[in-house]
């Protein structure tokens, strides 16, 4: 059963969502950036942010401890929204909760910069991290579009012959931009996302590239020899089957994957500061430490 707090938050989201759906891309970006700045204010005196001059990114570093681990964090936003402040928001939370250096990437967005811009930026960020940390000390974490991008990045890392990170953690990853497996019931249950809105964003991101291209929709890629994976998803979201199918395919290809499905939760519920979010963060901490701390 969902917590009282999550039920209240869900009600508020349901009331506000019709208005949010009316926002154009620019207003959506401004809203996400504002949320990121709010997270940063909450993290004051816990996390420091340092600009990275060579790539469009920032380091989020925990103030009260040293760390020899690194997280490459890829934010969500349907590939059309999110930005520097939004990335630093949840990236800062990861730095504080997982006690790690977090590289918060501000990757280029569609429609101004369609595929493969975001993937190219993710590759450069990972190469930058590899110059500072050994691969066994690096994890990739992504949510929503950033979760799908994280898996696309792994496929590209393998293609380039780079060392694989220690593990990957994703939250409600968008792994199939064709949206062929999103059911009508999934769309109705999700208070945050709509199938129509996602497909619109998918076409903006893909541009002239087919939606089932494995670097656009990693579910169609070669998922052999992937690092250990942890996936979080809610039962009440459009992308539920993306997570289930990705988990199943990882297992079929001989990889180790853990799938955590939270009842009555919606898209990227982990980011909402709920009791259910706390439980997910604790699972994330345990998984991250198992794979990066010697």
Where are these regions (language model features)?
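A glycine/proline-hinged amphipathic helix-loop "lid/cap" segment
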Residues: 1-65, 293-294
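Alpha/beta-hydrolase superfamily serine-hydrolase fold, recognizing
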Residues: 15, 52-58, 62-294
């Amino acid at each position: 059963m969902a917590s009282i707090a999550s039920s209240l938050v869900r009600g508020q989201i349901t009331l506000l969502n019709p208005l949010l759906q009316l926002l154009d891309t620019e207003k959506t970006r401004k809203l996400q950036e504002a949320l990121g700045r709010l997270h940063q204010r909450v993290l004051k005196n816990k996390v420091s942010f340092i600009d990275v001059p060579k790539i469009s990114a920032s380091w989020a570093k925990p103030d009260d401890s040293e760390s020899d681990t690194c997280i490459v964090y890829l934010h969500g936003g349907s590939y059309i929204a999110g930005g520097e402040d939004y990335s630093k928001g949840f990236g800062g939370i990861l730095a504080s909760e997982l006690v790690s250096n977090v590289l918060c990437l501000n990757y280029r967005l569609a429609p101004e910069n369609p595929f493969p811009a975001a993937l190219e930026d993710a590759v450069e960020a990972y190469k930058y991290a590899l110059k500072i940390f050994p691969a066994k000390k690096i994890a990739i974490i992504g949510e929503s579009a950033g979760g799908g991008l994280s898996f696309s990045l792994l496929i590209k890392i393998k293609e380039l012959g780079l060392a694989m990170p220690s593990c990957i953690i994703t939250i409600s990853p968008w792994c199939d931009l064709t949206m062929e497996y999103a059911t009508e019931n999934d769309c109705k249950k999700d208070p945050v996302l709509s199938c129509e809105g996602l497909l619109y964003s998918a076409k903006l991101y893909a541009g002239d590239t087919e939606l089932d291209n494995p670097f656009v929709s990693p579910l169609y890629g070669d998922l052999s020899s992937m690092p250990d994976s942890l996936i979080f998803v809610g039962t009440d979201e459009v992308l539920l089957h993306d997570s289930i199918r990705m988990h199943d395919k990882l297992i079929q290809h001989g990889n180790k994957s853990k799938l955590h499905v939270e009842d009555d939760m919606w898209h990227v519920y982990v980011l909402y500061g709920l009791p259910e979010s706390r439980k997910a963060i604790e699972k994330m901490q345990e998984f991250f430490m198992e794979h990066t701390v010697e």
